[in-house]
Amino acid sequence: MSNFEMAGTGSSRNNEEDNQQNTNWVWYKHTNNNLSTSHNNQIWQQPSLDLYPGQIDVCDMTTSSRSLTISCQECGNQAKKGCTHGRCRTCCKSNGLHCPTHVRSTWIPIAKRRERQQQLQTPTSNPTGGSGRVGKYRDINQHATLDSSGLEMGETRFPDEVSSDALFRCVRMSGTDDGEGQYAYQTTVGIAGHLFKGILYNQGPENKSMRSTQFYENPPRS
């Protein structure tokens, strides 16, 4: 019995060694596959580059759609997008580099920016105060002087007051806010050799203190 047990014990040890060898063979085979796979990955994988300030990784631009911030190679500020030298406008100009992206500057001084913001924030009021329309007026760049005889601008002198016959045509103005329209009168007059056109809007009932104006439906034409 003891010999039989010893033989069985020896056979079991041999089986364990065979299993261990088989296990080791399978484990080494799996390791070789990993090595071959990693070797293939190393062949196809592109090496990473050390980027200096102002350089762009071309691989990131083709594979990523996020916006990149480019720094100037000299001062470290934000460089102009599309600059081939990788510098800002000031550094390109100081070094004498001809860059097409730095030809025109989009920088606006802070004084002009504040003035523009104040103009946008200031509402334009209607001088007549009638139907709440916002009038748009063009600034006159030429210097004008006003005296007792009228307004003089350049070589043209405009009278202070004009009394002339004009034809007023009744037109219907459509409203954009409420959809309801109103009636107005359109006229064209010539003063001092210049043509003036305008529209008279309805300002409500006539005030008795105002000087009445006599209108003709069909005024005589010269």
Curated annotation (Swiss-Prot):
Knockout consequences: No visible phenotype.
Disordered: annotated span: 114-137
Subcellular location: Nucleus
One GO BP annotation of this record: auxin-activated signaling pathway
DNA-binding region(s) from the entry: 72-99
Keyword Phosphoprotein listed: no
Assigned keywords, A-Z: Activator, Auxin biosynthesis, Auxin signaling pathway, Developmental protein, DNA-binding, Metal-binding, Nucleus, Zinc
Motif (Required for homo- and heterodimerization) on chain: 191-194
Pfam families: DUF702
The protein, known as: Protein SHI RELATED SEQUENCE 4
Source species of the chain: Arabidopsis thaliana
